[in-house]
Amino acid sequence: MTTRSTDQTEHLRALGQKTPYPAAGPSTDLLEAFPNRFPDRPYIVSIAFPEFTSLCPVTGQPDFATIVVEYIPDQFCVESKSFKVYMFAFRDHQSFMETITNTILDDMTTKLQPLWCRVKGLFTPRGGTQLHVFAERFKEVEPARAQALRDMVSEWKRENNRHGA
């Protein structure tokens, strides 16, 4: 017999449907969120997208990367299929690597309003140069909670680096 959680899914559009690959470029409208059932328990979500592609804004040459988004949800979590569609929207989008990484951070924080979010753009070498871009943002919260979140993130970074992720 199949059992089911009480996760709210009625409002999700992308999951369970044929995957549309947007031609219009990245937009927060592509991202969907669902309610975080554990807002009083800080935990970290890490999503890696190893098939990221975009285009150089000068040469039009393809750039390849692994994009890693890490966040501590507050009231919302990102739905993973919508995240995949959002990542694919960069495929024919021309932008610098630094702009891409910061755009993803801005879009994720706009959509989710997480307590903390970090985006790592781990770009494949091109022309003999490898570029890694890290951008992060903490949500404004009361000082005691802010320190607890910073401690948690610091521990996460130490632990995560130990595993090479």
Curated annotation (Swiss-Prot):
UniProt-annotated location(s): Cytoplasm
Top-level division of the source organism's lineage: Bacteria
Molecular function as annotated in GO: preQ1 synthase activity
Entry's EC annotation: 1.7.1.13
Enzymatic class: oxidoreductase
InterPro entries: GTP-CH-I_C/QueF (IPR043133), NADPH_dep_7-cyano-7-deazaG_red (IPR050084), QueF (IPR029500), QueF_type1 (IPR016856)
Pfam families: QueF (PF14489)
GO terms under cellular component: cytoplasm
Catalytic residues (UniProt): C56 (thioimide intermediate), D63 (proton donor)
Keywords from the named record: Cytoplasm, NADP, Oxidoreductase, Queuosine biosynthesis
Catalytic activity: 7-aminomethyl-7-carbaguanine + 2 NADP(+) = 7-cyano-7-deazaguanine + 2 NADPH + 3 H(+)
Pathway recorded for this protein: tRNA modification; tRNA-queuosine biosynthesis
GO biological process: queuosine biosynthetic process; tRNA modification
Stretches the record annotates as Disordered: 1-24
Binding site for substrate: V78, E79, S80, M97, E98
Family: Belongs to the GTP cyclohydrolase I family. QueF type 1 subfamily.
HAMAP family: QueF_type1
NCBIfam families referenced in this protein's UniProt entry, alphabetically: QueF-II
Function: Catalyzes the NADPH-dependent reduction of 7-cyano-7-deazaguanine (preQ0) to 7-aminomethyl-7-deazaguanine (preQ1).
Protein name (Swiss-Prot/TrEMBL): NADPH-dependent 7-cyano-7-deazaguanine reductase
